[in-house]
Amino acid sequence: MSQDNKGNGSKKRDFLGFTGLDAAKIIELFDYSLFIKQQRETNRNSDEFRPIRHKTVAMIFNKPSLRTRVSFELGVYELGGHAISLEGKSIGVGERESIEDIARLLSRYNDAIVARLHEHEIIETLAKHADIPVINALTDLSHPCQVLADAFTLYEKGLWRDDIKVVFVGDGNNVANSWIELAGILPFHFVLACPEGYLPDETLLKQARSNAKGTIEILHDPMEAAKQADVLYTDVWTSMGQEEEMAERLKAFAPFQINAKMVAEAKPSAVIMHCMPAHRGQEISAEVMDGPQSIIIDEAENRLHVQKALMVKLMNHDVYRKFHLTHRLHRAANRLKA
């Protein structure tokens, strides 16, 4: 998650994925996300908590966005900063100007870069040549901010534990890749149920399995995968840029819809998750999407809180570190009282 700045020996922290994080650091981020969420609920109109006051965040969007754009722009505003939205086509990432020059220039103007791109190599190049934090807001390879919010939602609801069984039903896409990457760090049981030919990134899978404290499975029978699941998770069957494959994908994924029959295979207490946008009647039935076990809107909301916590960690680490020092002192004091 961190890398050396060029020449000055100090640390620049990026968030391109879960590499460099351990379980303790992720739980710390979840605890700070809870604090951020509580701050918003109790002090929404207060000017007291503005840890990135007067800082600017350049936001590069090469892909359409609703949740990512709104949650990041609002998050920057609520933390006291200012977001500058840049459409990828207008600045010509890697075409009109080189990625290296864009990274160096934005580093002179801004305090962080948030990028939602197609090629993962572009965000890696941005991070390599920028002197400010770079956050991966989605690439074709991964979507770590989404999965961070997903796992936080389970943590917040008291559902996260070492033996939790999370079943991702659908395409081995960028969201599935990030779940696999997380499963290489946190000890839990992750199952990807996908058709043959729609597997996740082989390199990420191999690396996660070599590090995994829990279990990572790839199955091709969705009903078998769903048995005794604590979480049933899905995403669209046809992602941006795959529209020409839609007919073929609809046929391949037809048995992989999360519906009442599949939910019946999971634990009675199981929750339903979807990163959205959702296509009711395709990857998930309307009955399940809007049913009592769905926590889909909760996870969408939590994008805001987790990303705010992440930005404070990257842009004002002193505030982030002070919270955790205080948090540890409180816990120690409570243990002594007990």
From Swiss-Prot:
Catalytic activity annotation: carbamoyl phosphate + L-ornithine = L-citrulline + phosphate + H(+)
InterPro entries: Asp/Orn_carbamoyltranf_P-bd, Asp/Orn_carbamoylTrfase, Asp/Orn_carbamoylTrfase_sf, Asp_carbamoyltransf_Asp/Orn-bd, Orn/put_carbamltrans, OTCase_ArgI
Listed pathway(s): Amino-acid biosynthesis; L-arginine biosynthesis; L-arginine from L-ornithine and carbamoyl phosphate: step 1/3
GO molecular function terms listed in the Swiss-Prot or TrEMBL record: amino acid binding; ornithine carbamoyltransferase activity
Superkingdom field: Bacteria
Record has Calcium as a keyword: no
EC identifiers of the protein: 2.1.3.3
Family according to the record: Belongs to the aspartate/ornithine carbamoyltransferase superfamily. OTCase family.
Protein name in UniProt: Ornithine carbamoyltransferase
Source species taxonomy: Bacteria, Pseudomonadati, Chlorobiota, Chlorobiia, Chlorobiales
